[in-house]
């Protein structure tokens, strides 16, 4: 039975410590079992979660950012899976010593049919990106209209999404399934048959901040009421979350009522927040209220139907459903692997293992060498 806070002024938030594999609707790995929500997610709801739509409304309570239109030729380059070569790079000429194996290898490739892969150049766009990065302090967190390349952090030299140049951004974007989905299937899981809204793609650059994963929370809003809060990094146990759950819930609820409630364009939505060491809450992002968004320690069946959100509350307590259910990971849980680990083997590398595309490896190694030279 999940633990919950006692009712009263200090116990109006139901705090549940998740034991992976024991909660209804979850499998043994601890991930919420995907359920098609009873609600119907509309394309308009997804469009309202575009960064450029909500940022002007909430810029005072979120991280400073710059939004740049994404040119069509840059979009085409991001979707071109033929090469990992990044524009703006010039490789120094390679000279092999006479009699070396490298010299022999160069002779093998000296063929009239051999082509040299060269990345396209985007001088005007590059200049705008460099100016934006400089205005944000020299380091940024990149994303597109909706998604950040969180599934591609492993490919960066620092295993981070921290970018200092356009080449860093391109490397992450071209390695990310999340970015590809933004560009090709932005309205996946939407149930309405209306035409897709017209979209202008944008590169979003956010000022780099060192955020502690244990201070991030995902909040679920239905009919403009905050119904659930989940620890964002549910694969780890954080003692401060378990011991401060009442305080965390209260500060997030107050932030929601003051800055978010009735101000977003929909009444059903998901938003992410960060609570800093001083207890101040910051808005991080908005997401659609539907299965395209990870429900973390909830299931979409619970969130859309309300089942299991009241638990064993009395009728008196049930009337106070304005207060959200809070779920976090407890200390008994075995450390879980990151949900992004499954993205660590791109198709390009599968191609390499089958001998289908060795040129991609050459491009990748050149790029890594250039990054090391710059550092």
What function would you assign to each model-found segment?
Residues 1-375:
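Preference for protein termini
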